[in-house]
A protein has these predicted regions:
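Beta-rich carbohydrate-recognition and catalytic domains
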Residues: 1-84, 92-143, 148-202, 207-210
Length: 210
């Protein structure tokens, strides 16, 4: 049973490719405007299921209805790798340094994958991608990373391990890691079985409610 009804019509989310077909939004809300906006979103285009344009993009809003590219920013933040594709953005506010941190997945679609991080002090100027996780032997083992800052200041990441077969994998697992700084992560642990008969674990989100 659905808790919330679907919206009568989708919101218009502009994408750099002009399709306005976006996926995997990650939205932050601020009590007062942060660099001019109360809401910041990371997302990727995904026109007609084409992952070649699934590159990290950032938008901002003050009402969640009208989303704009902030002045001075050009999407995407980083282009698609060759070979492979980007996907699965996660936007986090780091209160220690007053920065937006954007995690995303890069897969070469051959044998390996990475979680990379870009940082910004104003939402417009972003650092070059840096590697925070790397799997050299499985191309889809770190999908849909979700990062939360815990009350004690530590970080925690959850993601879906689909091995080398992606969404067709029938034994997907949810993994988790911890970190002291959001950059260096512990060895992974497997969460307790979250499988449901007839369903596959795919994209997820986690929200910490203290």
């Amino acid at each position: 049973m659905s808790i919330l009804k679907n919206a009568p019509q989708p919101e218009l989310i502009p994408t750099y490719d002009g399709s306005n077909q976006s996926t995997h939004p990650s939205v932050l809300q601020f009590d007062t405007p942060w660099n001019g906006y109360r809401f910041w979103m990371a997302m990727t285009p995904y026109p007609f299921n084409y992952d070649g344009l699934e590159d990290p993009s950032v938008l901002a809003s003050n009402d969640t209805k009208t989303w704009v590219v902030p002045d001075g920013l050009t999407n995407p933040l980083t282009p698609a790798p060759k070979p492979g594709h980007n996907c699965d953005v996660e936007l986090v506010y780091n209160r220690d340094c007053n920065e937006l941190w954007l995690y995303y997945v890069e897969a070469d679609d051959i044998v390996q994958s990475w979680v990379k991080l870009m940082r910004s002090k104003d939402g417009v100027h972003w650092t070059k991608p840096e590697i925070v996780l790397h799997d050299p032997v499985q191309k889809y083992s770190i999908l849909s990373p979700c990062v939360q800052r815990m009350q004690d200041g530590t970080w925690r990441m959850w993601y879906v391990d689909t091995g080398n077969t992606g969404y067709q994998n029938q034994s997907n697992k949810v993994r988790t890691r911890t970190s002291e700084d959001g950059l260096h992560w512990s060895a992974e642990e497997t969460c307790e079985d979250l499988s449901q008969p007839g369903y596959q674990i795919w994209h997820l989100t986690v929200w910490h409610d203290p």
